């Protein structure tokens, strides 16, 4: 990373980068943050520093969390307020524009055909996709949802866990960790369920029925925070 930062004119991020934020760069380098979401349901970045599920305040300062950005891409004017808080920047660095992930969402890549060819046993059911955000209670919450679908005929629950959480194990259900991306699974799904994940905004682009499963809303609000 250090070599490419030293030899590049532009660096584009979709997450926090230690090398970008901690190092001093040449003045000609432009750093663009295009966060990996189309919105901000939950508090994140600097918004969540010091909370139970956020970063430690001393560590975030020592690691210069979200420093050195020249521009922050925001998908809407309403989201801009939360992005300024999360990235510690003012309005002069915010650029309102559509994000590349929207093009990915709208691109037809035959995901359904490929998925059902590989998983023919799922082709006759309505697919309900559960996309939880990362939190320590993931497995417990997923088990609750499993109970809700236990006696529902004609629907198959697919659980796609957050990339940071790999401990979800749901017996007799289809816990997915294969080669299809989250967007592929969203294209396949008939119904999408989430909680505090920004995938809710992606689901709205797909025009799919969307439900929020938030049995821990009060606890999560106090531990992490909701925008």
Feature map (PLM): residue ranges:
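Active-site and donor-binding regions of nucleotide-sugar-utilizing enzymes
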Residues: 1-106
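Short aromatic-enriched loop/helix-cap "lid" or pocket-rim segments at secondary-structure transitions
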Residues: 43-47, 107-109, 169-172, 222-225
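Structural alpha-helical scaffold elements that stabilize or flank donor/cofactor-binding regions
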Residues: 3-4, 24, 65, 121, ...
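Catalytic binding pocket for nucleotide-activated donors in carbohydrate/polymer assembly enzymes
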Residues: 171, 198-227
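Donor nucleotide-activated moiety binding/catalytic core segment of transferases
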Residues: 2-5, 10, 163-201, 205-206
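Redox-cofactor binding/interface segments in oxidoreductases and associated redox assembly factors
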Residues: 12-13, 33, 74, 130, ...
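Short, polar loop motifs at secondary-structure junctions
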Residues: 15-19, 77, 161-167, 197
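Conserved catalytic-core segment of nucleotide-activated headgroup transferases in glycan assembly
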Residues: 86, 94-171
